A protein has these predicted regions:
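Juxtamembrane interface at the cytosolic side of transmembrane helices
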Residues: 263-294
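Sec/Tat signal peptide C-region and signal peptidase I cleavage site
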Residues: 17-23
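Extended, hydrophilic extramembrane loops/domains of integral membrane proteins
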Residues: 214-257
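C-type cytochrome heme c attachment motif
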Residues: 74-85, 132-139, 152-161, 190, ...
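Acidic, low-complexity proline/glycine-rich segments
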Residues: 24-53
Length: 294
């Protein structure tokens, strides 16, 4: 029996090492997939895998950096909100970013929302209040598509959880132990910073933009949205595309999972409870069966 178990474990270890070696051989040193594919072969998107970035909210003890979230809100407000909605995020939640009620109320008042009907049965517009949600920039999906090369920009409420690149074997096995859950922010950052010139011989359709990090194709309708110095920061943070991308990715992660910190604290306490409970069960078992004949 011991020999059989040892053989199974040896085969498992060999399979893991073999898969890792195969993955290393199949992927270039920079982590990018080949830009060209054999004729007739179906390309695998994204053409380049997103790089794992450093995030304050990563790991079992991760937490949101409020200063970064405030910068990300500024990037979203001044750049992204022109095309992308956040229909599921109410203004009142901005107090979790470190703003007081007066600041949240003033921020919401910068927007107008549709309300009604009034006593005359007509719809009307009014200034937003903290209980309102971020308004959409377009009246409907058709209007959004007509203004963006035929592709309606997705809502950003849950984009950090909805957009991610699948990690193959054996990476997804290791992710269980490293608690890697930042696929979405890594993808968003890679996409925003990944615009580049297409390789020789690659034809970009009219109205398209080459980005090897796009999850569905090599070309997308959205032009490069960020440039250095585009958004002014008041806290002295670098005003670069890389920093903008990290900040807005963090903000979108918060929008998608605002209770992340509470979830991680609860999970840690549950693990402590289970550890103590396991010890108590073991000691109880030893006490009960201490004088029993086996």
């Amino acid at each position: 029996m011991k020999t059989l178990v040892a053989s199974i474990l040896s085969l498992a270890v060999a399979a893991v090492l073999g898969s890792a070696a195969f993955a290393q051989e199949a992927t270039p040193a920079n982590g990018a997939a080949p830009a060209h594919h054999e004729e007739g072969a179906t390309p695998h998107y994204p053409l380049k895998e997103p790089k794992e970035e450093e995030w304050s909210f990563a790991g079992p003890f991760g937490h949101y950096d409020k200063a970064q979230l405030q910068r990300g809100l500024k990037v979203y407000t001044e750049v992204c909100s022109a095309c992308h909605s956040m229909n599921l995020v109410p203004f009142r939640m901005l107090d979790e970013l470190g703003y007081n009620q007066a600041q949240v109320k003033a921020f919401a008042a910068n927007y107008e929302v549709q309300d009604g009907p009034n006593a005359a049965g007509e719809m009307f517009t009014r200034k937003a209040v903290p209980s309102d949600h971020f308004p959409a920039p377009f009246a409907n999906a058709e209007a959004a598509a007509a203004s963006n090369n035929g592709a309606a920009p997705p809502d950003f409420s849950l984009i950090a959880k909805a957009r991610e690149v699948e990690r193959g074997f054996p990476q997804f096995v290791f992710d269980v132990f490293t608690q890697y859950q930042e696929n979405g922010p890594d993808y968003i950052h890679a996409l925003l910073t990944g615009y580049e010139e297409p390789p020789a011989g690659f034809q970009v359709p009219q109205g398209g933009h080459y980005n090897p990090y796009f999850h569905a194709a090599a070309v997308l309708a959205m032009p490069k949205p960020l440039s250095d110095g585009q958004v002014t920061y008041d806290d002295g943070a670098p005003q670069t595309v890389d920093q903008y991308s990290k900040d807005v990715s963090s903000f979108l992660m918060w929008a998608a999972e605002p209770h992340l910190e509470e979830r991680k604290r609860t999970g840690f306490m549950v693990m402590i409870f289970l550890a103590i409970f396991t010890v108590l069960i073991y000691l109880t078992k030893r006490s009960v069966y201490a004088n029993k004949d086996h």
